[in-house]
Amino acid sequence: MSSDELKRQAAAVALEQVRDGMKLGLGTGSTAKHFVELLGAKVQGGLQVVGVPTSEVTRADAERCGIPLATLDEVDHLDLTVDGADEIDPALNLVKGGGGALLREKIVAAASGRMIVIADDSKLVETLGRFPLPIEVIPFGLAATRRAIEQALAVCGIDGELKLRNGKDGHAFVTDGGHWIVDAHLGRIPDAPRLAGLLSVIPGIVEHGLFIGLASSVVLASPHGIRIIERPACRDSGESK
């Protein structure tokens, strides 16, 4: 079974949580695209939902699938966000942003009552850091921002390499918000919450790809079946899978 087939299976399980009248955050990336396509088929069958896309790419996909869309300014809350992840640890902390949409993804996730992460089982890791950590930055003063990032990494005992992400044209990749992305190749992040806190206070950083405490549950698809992992706080509150 291909990775693409596994992603679609995970998306189908997440779709079971969608109810008529919900306001949904629509993630970005190859896995989230499967969810958007499956959701679109349900909408064509009469399901009534409103989606808030996390990128212009997702907006185009959702429009193509006939999903009614809104902005966060036009809805008072989001019931659920469904999105993928580049890495997931056992505490359901995430690395996201490989597709470059981390800022809007985090804003939408934080505005949601629940966040379901969908992925194939290769994304579950013991410790975050194997996948490069995306850090969205302001172009102005980039050298100073890089030095501050390096200092934060040193405080956490991490010796990493920072690389400015380039687009297909060979120039700096530009996010939907007009920013650049520095990918931090770290190998291992021993204390993700601590690093997230240090990065969050650096002037010049718009947002980083560590999603701490935002995922309510994770749907992992493997050749052996579906595994659902819930964040302990969600289990304690009786939140349904």
UniProtKB/Swiss-Prot annotation:
It is an enzyme of class 5 (isomerase). Keywords: Isomerase. The active site is at E105 (proton acceptor). InterPro entries: NagB/RpiA_transferase-like, Ribose-5P_isomerase, Ribose5P_isomerase_typA_subgr, Ribose5P_isomerase_type_A. It comes from the Bacteria. Pfam families: Rib_5-P_isom_A (PF06026). Pathway: Carbohydrate degradation; pentose phosphate pathway; D-ribose 5-phosphate from D-ribulose 5-phosphate (non-oxidative stage): step 1/1. CDD domains: RPI_A (cd01398). This is Ribose-5-phosphate isomerase A.
